[in-house]
Amino acid sequence: MKFIALKTKDGSSKGNITFFCRVLYVSRQGYYQYLVMKDRPWKYQPLADAMKDILAEDICNDTYGRTRMYQALTMKQPKNVDIPSERTVYRVMEEIGISHHPRRKPNGITKADREARKSEDLLKRDFHAEERLTKCVTDMTEIKGCDGKLYVSAIFDCFDSSVIGLAMDTNMKASLCKETLENAAKAYPNIRGAIIHSDRGIQYTSQLYREAIQKYGIQQSMNSAGGRCHDNARCESMWARMKTELLYDRYDTEKMTTDELKTIIWRYFTSYWNNRRICSTTVSYTHLRAHETELHL
């Protein structure tokens, strides 16, 4: 703006340039460099346009940070766009006002039954999986609606963070966890032998859930003694991302019915999360592309 002050209405320089530069605390070199560069097109404009196109693909994409935006650009390879480093992508995002800063995180809701029999912690915080349907995590979260609370239960595959089982209800009984497991087994019959890790909530230590685990030949894993939240950090992270991307600053959930909440959550997980969303916490974001291809066959 200081450089603009040195120009007349017709755009020509007027007066003693050296004097004006001293008054405005700018250098003559900087001023003349501004004159040379001001009419040149911004070299990152094609990149900025490509990033805006990515955000426009889905309403939830506006939560993309530097990493996922960089990965999206690398996957899509937009025409006539030279993809720079991730750091430069971040600078351009800041410049055009689309950088994302994470906000709130949800708290866990399940309560441990100290008297119930527990299963061993088979994962020991190692959420890395070389193949699909070998390591999974499960948990529940709650969302307040105008007619009560909606409880969402899901099973996530550690390989690519995809949702393989999903169920929702207005109660958080063990039957909800059992339904989630049954939905996963129906959709993925080869889940037999997989490890499914959970916290020590009464739903997961119940006889009903244990019988379902045995029925489908699944290995049950639970948080270590003491119920440390980090033992199931992967699942807690999924809920945090879902609420940040889908709910926070978009919907006033307490003015929505539980049926309305069910609709947007089903759509989010089945249409967006499992098909189009880039998850930077996976082994490699290219695994998500492979999963998309499989789902569309």
Name every feature range the model reports, one short phrase each.
Residues 1-12, 41-88:
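A short, amphipathic alpha-helix used for macromolecular contacts
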Residues 217-221, 234-258, 266-279:
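Active-site proximal helix-loop segment of RNase H-like, two-metal nucleases, encompassing DDE(D)
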Residues 109-112, 198-200, 206-210, 222-244, ...:
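RNase H-like two-metal-ion nuclease catalytic core shared by retroviral integrases
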Residues 28-34, 85-94:
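Major-groove recognition helix of helix-turn-helix-like DNA-binding domains
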Residues 17-22, 69:
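Short alpha-helical "recognition helix" segments of helix-turn-helix
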Residues 22-25, 140-173, 182-185:
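Short conserved beta-strand segments at catalytic cores or DNA/RNA-binding microdomains
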Residues 83, 90-154, 178-180, 187-193:
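Mobile-element integrase/transposase regions
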Residues 286-295:
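Conserved small/polar residues in nucleotide/adenosyl-binding loops
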